[in-house]
A protein has these predicted regions:
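Surface-exposed, charge/polar-rich loops and edge strands
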Residues: 1-173
Length: 173
């Protein structure tokens, strides 16, 4: 689907070759469509986070994606959200039973601490810029102290930040 104005950057770390190697090891992939906008790159300029307004982004979660994710969850396997956009999308489309539901529409969901995640028990994320909504989401998922420790190591080790930067894997506690 056409419509994104920016790339969902965390997925750039997954080459076809890497995905094939993961598939051989029994890892299933599920795909959603999220028309990523520029709003996530805007600094948060309010002290009260409940007053921050996210730009709406169009998203599509199809039946096949739901089937793959829900079967993995029911088997007790890891469900890994690749990127903050995917995490926002699945948290928008998750039902009260904790299962992913088909969804076609828009989301302006802003995830910030504290937040109780419903579906993913792992997340891949790039290293985001300070004061960004994306960093807020990562801190919500990984815990502020753990994420800031990772960022301090990234700074010391000259990791790259931003869209074409390095990534981290966060596993649920």
């Amino acid at each position: 689907n056409e419509g994104a104005v920016t790339v969902p950057a965390a997925g750039l770390h997954f080459s076809r070759e890497l995905m094939k190697r993961m598939e051989i090891k029994g890892i299933d992939f599920s795909f959603i469509t999220m028309h990523c906008g520029l709003g996530g790159f805007r600094d948060i300029d309010v002290e009260d986070l409940t007053k921050h307004k996210m730009d709406s982004e169009q998203m599509f979660v199809e039946a096949e994606a739901c089937r793959i994710v829900n079967e993995a969850k029911d088997r007790g396997n890891k469900v890994c959200a690749v990127g903050t956009d995917v995490m926002r999308a699945i948290e928008t489309a998750v039902g009260t039973d904790g299962h992913l539901k088909e969804f076609e529409g828009w989301t302006n969901k802003f995830i910030f601490p504290p937040y109780d995640f419903s579906l993913a028990n792992a997340m891949v994320s790039n290293f985001h810029m300070p004061l960004s909504t994306m960093l807020m989401l990562v801190c919500s998922y990984g815990g502020y102290e753990l994420v800031m420790d990772a960022y301090n190591i990234a700074l010391k080790e000259d990791y790259r930040f931003g869209t074409y930067g390095d990534a981290m894997l966060i596993l649920d506690k």
